[in-house]
Amino acid sequence: MTRLAEILDQMSAVLNDLKTVMDQEQQHLSMGQINGSQLQWITEQKSSLLATLDYLEQLRRKEPNTANSVDISQRWQEITVKTQQLRQMNQHNGWLLEGQIERNQQALEMLKPHQEPTLYGANGQTSTTHRGGKKISI
């Protein structure tokens, strides 16, 4: 097996791992109740896999071009198909994330009128205004 074939096989394995992580991301975003630490872990996994993929791509570009090799062409075609599938999946996950952000914004907007305004007092410290009552100090 040539060095280029080994690199392409490694790229394919990383893409498979990336699909697994993106499947987890999709399931997590579809649940409706988001666990921030779980989503952060998924994001870190994706970043790590993408960095590995970038490194392998740099190695691949340094290898001599053997475009006429059927074996290499088949491997590259598989990588291209996987990459296109992952791009579509990433776009779908992005839509799910945007929907979640929008729901969070709506929830915050609903809570905003019920939040007591925070004001600065004469001493420069924050204080909240009290509604409907008198503040008495002795």
UniProtKB/Swiss-Prot annotation:
Species per Swiss-Prot/TrEMBL record: Escherichia coli (strain K12)
UniProt keyword list: Bacterial flagellum biogenesis, Cytoplasm
Span list, region Disordered: 117-138
Protein name, entry field: Flagella synthesis protein FlgN
Predominant location: cytoplasm
Subcellular location per the Swiss-Prot or TrEMBL entry: Cytoplasm
Signal peptide range in chain numbering: none
Keyword Cytoplasm recorded: yes
Pfam family, one: FlgN
GO cellular component terms, A-Z: cytoplasm
Keyword flag Nucleotidyltransferase: no
Coiled coil ranges: none
Function: Required for the efficient initiation of filament assembly.
GO biological process: bacterial-type flagellum assembly
Family (UniProt): Belongs to the FlgN family.
